[in-house]
Amino acid sequence: CGSDMHAYHGKDERRVPPLILGHEVSGTIQNGKFKGKVVVLNPLISCRKCHYCKNQREHLCPERSMIGMSKPLKREGGLAEFVSIPNTNIYEIPSSLDVKEAALAEPVAVSLHAVLLGEQTLKQPIKDCRILIQGAGAIGLICGLILSKEKKCKKIVMSDPNKLRLKECSKYLDAKFVEPKNQEIDENGFDMVIDSVGLEVSRQQAIHVVAPGGSIIHIGLTEPSGNFNFRKLTIQEITLIGTYCYTNKDFKETMNILTNKKLGSLKWIEYRDLKKGPEAFKEIHNGKCVAPKIILIP
């Protein structure tokens, strides 16, 4: 996950070493209520008692924690042979779903939540919108696949400075693929912008290219602050909405999406041995990784 890379770079205050990273996890339960079951884990743990939890907004629980994080509560993550998690966060996998593909449930839930939240802000049917997706990583690609295959959107542009990633995504997503400075990314040219990057420069581009009355859906967490054109946001009635994680309902829906192959081919996932994890981090850091998602197998 991109957030694991933030930790790798020492830029995530919620992930402080020593810590086992990893929150996109599937496998076989070794003990307890679900012993022997093949499952996927919802890594987001909430109190289940507060106002937010009782109103199906568990991702906003003030006591939430996540495996693979050290704050607010240290919970070791899934980049290991074993991981511990409450029974309430365990979902059995249908026999028709490959256990390795099931590990994609968490980023699919993140992407689904972002698309649904963004759709609520629009003033026209989402299928008719001009949409820019910033970032050709897993979240950007999955958002694009949901928009294209589930929401029937036809006017999608994906931007990323990594040409290798763009080329790989072009094999699976029906969209235009451009670098961020491409002329096709026009001022006021998009009804919705999905920022899966979260840099100051991506936010500046998002507000520049979003059309009057349009929406910016902010997912990325790379840089927490920076300059932003709030004047345009105000006088052009732009909706800027942050989106974090997903609800339990979103997570359950991802099981339906994955089981029924609604994202199409998942050959863009690369599988590697867990022992080769350090090499994967280095490749991503150096911009040499083609795959939008690498899954490590213990």
Per-range role (PLM):
Residues 200-260, 297-298:
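Glycine-rich phosphate-binding loop and adjacent beta-alpha segment
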Residues 11-54, 94-96:
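Glycine-rich beta-strand-centered segment in the early N-terminal region that forms part
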Residues 97-180:
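Mid-domain Rossmann-like dinucleotide-binding core that forms the NAD(H)/NADP(H) cofactor-binding site
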Residues 40, 194, 217:
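N-terminal Rossmann-like NAD(P) cofactor-binding module of classical short-chain dehydrogenase/reductase
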Residues 49-134:
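NAD(P)H dinucleotide-binding glycine-rich loop of Rossmann-like/cofactor-binding domains
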Residues 176-182, 271-276:
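Short acidic-hydrophobic, aromatic-tinged amphipathic segments that line or gate anion-handling sites
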Residues 204, 248, 252-298:
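C-terminal hydrophobic helical "lid"/dimerization subdomain
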Residues 184-193:
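A short acidic, Gly/Pro-enriched loop at the edge of an enzyme's catalytic core
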